[in-house]
């Protein structure tokens, strides 16, 4: 019988009572309590499977293993050194098959074979994960090759995939190969791409090394404090050349330059978001957005063909009665109405948020965004302009 101090713990208490007791303890304590007996192990592991559907693994800068469970969000946050294989093996043993959402880095997935996981040869490591947030910082040649060799055994079917890339000029090609492997393996997933870099040149070079892919969202984030320039015409050119289509585009912490003669996108956009940016030329940005909206096209990019009206004639038949032949019935004309397909809005929404500087309208101070809204709604009537989240520091 298990003893704790001078008190004796009776392991054959009803399951309901044990669950009430286990609810009072956090994750590290429960991991110790599961060693009491097999029955306690089964109850605690069942509790973990119900309460942990998301895992976040952070292995950068951690000196010793830590685990924190957030029960309301059904999340388990792990921070541990890169060589904590036994610690991670215990975490996966308890609740690996209950994970539906995962946040981790490319180095962890590339070295997953070093962690002991009890599974069949034909099973995936995380067969129930549907949402993956993957961090890529230093995908060198060794990490890339190990990941490409094992990526087919990681997940069954991803529905949501977010790739956060900290751009490094030495790894342009490796990032492109990793992204390509995800596209080929999970063609039906919604892909979000985040690119973090100090200079726009690194962003553009990384995009030029990506394969052709449809994105739900692309987010370009500047990590330099001085807000270097990002030319929207150059971004348009490289995305068009690589055939990279994104439904939503977000810019953050850049100094944006628009030439006024190039659209901001060559494919239809749901949202174009400018967050905490300095807009160098407001007039040219308005012109570029107007050019983008003027690219409105029909469904599938082809105007609907005119269809001829279909007239169906009812067959004429003579009805003979005792009184003679009845008059022929009138002809029924059926007209098929063909509705014209409405053109698709090429850009539906523009969002301006955060601490933005609108050069050319700064004399209006805190009313600058209202003038931007007025110009855009005048030139592009169907555009939804949202500046509700903008703020000023003066």
Curated annotation (Swiss-Prot):
- Indicate yes or no for the key word Membrane: no
Give start and end of each F-box domain: 7-51
Q: Does the keyword Transit peptide apply?
A: no
* Keyword line: Ubl conjugation pathway
Q: What's the protein called, per UniProt?
A: Uncharacterized F-box protein ZK328.6
Its source organism is: Caenorhabditis elegans
């Amino acid at each position: 019988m298990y003893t704790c101090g001078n008190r004796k713990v009776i392991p054959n208490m009803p399951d309901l009572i044990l669950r009430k007791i286990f609810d009072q303890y956090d994750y590290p304590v429960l991991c110790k309590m599961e060693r009491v007996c097999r029955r306690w192990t089964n109850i605690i592991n069942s509790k973990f499977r119900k309460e942990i559907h998301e895992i976040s693994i952070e292995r950068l800068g951690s000196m010793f293993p830590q685990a924190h469970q957030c029960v309301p969000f059904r999340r388990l946050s792990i921070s541990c050194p890169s060589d904590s294989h036994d610690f991670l093996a215990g975490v996966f043993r308890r609740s690996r098959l209950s994970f539906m959402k995962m946040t981790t880095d490319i180095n962890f997935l590339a070295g997953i074979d070093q962690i002991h996981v009890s599974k069949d040869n034909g099973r995936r490591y995380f067969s129930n994960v549907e949402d993956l947030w993957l961090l890529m910082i230093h995908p060198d040649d060794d990490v890339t090759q190990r990941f490409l060799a094992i990526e087919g055994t990681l997940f069954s079917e991803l529905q949501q995939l977010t790739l956060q890339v900290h751009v490094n000029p030495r790894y342009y090609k490796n990032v492109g190969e990793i992204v390509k492997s995800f596209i080929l393996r999970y063609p039906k997933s919604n892909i979000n791409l985040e690119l973090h870099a100090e200079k726009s040149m690194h962003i553009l070079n990384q995009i030029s090394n990506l394969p052709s892919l449809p994105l739900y969202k692309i987010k370009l984030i500047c990590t330099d404090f001085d807000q270097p320039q990002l030319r929207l015409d150059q971004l348009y050119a490289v995305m068009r050349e690589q055939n990279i289509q994104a439904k939503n585009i977000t810019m953050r912490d850049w100094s944006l330059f628009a030439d006024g003669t190039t659209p901001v996108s060559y494919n239809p956009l749901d949202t174009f978001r400018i967050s905490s940016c300095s807009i160098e030329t407001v007039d040219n940005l308005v012109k570029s957005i107007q050019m983008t909206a003027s690219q409105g096209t029909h469904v599938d990019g082809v105007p609907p063909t005119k269809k001829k009206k279909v007239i169906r004639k009812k067959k004429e038949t003579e009805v003979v009665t005792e009184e003679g032949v009845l008059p022929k019935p009138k002809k029924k004309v059926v007209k098929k109405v063909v509705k014209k397909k409405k053109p698709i809005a090429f850009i539906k929404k523009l969002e301006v948020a955060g601490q933005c500087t609108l050069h050319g309208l700064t004399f209006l101070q805190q009313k600058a965004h209202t003038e931007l809204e007025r110009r855009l709604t005048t030139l592009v009537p169907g555009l939804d302009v949202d500046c509700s989240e903008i703020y000023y520091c003066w």
